Amino acid sequence: MNDKKLERHIAKSEIYELVCMYMRGLDRLDGPLLKSVFHEDAYCDYGFVKTDPDTFSKFCMDALKEHIANHHMIGNSLIEFDDSEDMAFGEIYFNAYHKTIVEGVNTDVIIAGRYLDRYERRNGIWKIAYRSEVNDWSKTEPTNDPYFDDSDCHRGGRQDDPVYKRNKMYRP
């Protein structure tokens, strides 16, 4: 493997990690983490909101805190480079699940779409410089999830989620 291929492989890995941290920030309602994946002068264009990362992060935290649960998953991730070694473009497929209450009824909102991103490496660090969201389809229906009524299950949370308790990840 030549040096350029190796550098691009490392860059793709670092960019993919940004995408994962973005999803964790949404699901765990971790505003500082969500904001950290963007350059300060980045632009977020989601159609219904077009703004800077700080305002976008606050918007997400306010909107998602009203949900019972959120779960974002990454699908196909195509990261491409043009001539610059410090700029890359991504098409990141996602599925977003939101458990909400609509008119007193627990409701599942499922969205499938893609993030169209421009990433820039500045001072050796990759971050999102531009992100847009394309929604390909969505589905809304009443929730049917009796499995999660079992109190013995580990439940995902917000900032009290087990992922933030790494010091307790040992066998008793």
Outline where the language-model segments fall.
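Short, cysteine-centered beta-strand-loop-beta hairpins and adjacent loop/turn segments enriched
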Residues: 97-107, 138-139
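Transmembrane beta-barrel outer-membrane domains
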Residues: 13, 69-70, 108-110
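A solvent-exposed, acidic/Ser-Thr-rich amphipathic alpha-helical stretch
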Residues: 31-98
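Short, low-complexity N-terminal intrinsically disordered segments enriched in polar/charged residues
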Residues: 1-24, 28, 32, 36
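Short beta-strand segments enriched in hydrophobic/aromatic residues
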Residues: 26, 38, 94-96, 132-135
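Short, surface-exposed coil-to-beta transition loops
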Residues: 72-74, 110-115
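Short beta-strand edge/turn micro-motifs at domain boundaries
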Residues: 87-89, 112-146
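Acidic/histidine-enriched, glycine/proline-rich intrinsically disordered or flexible terminal extensions
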Residues: 141-172
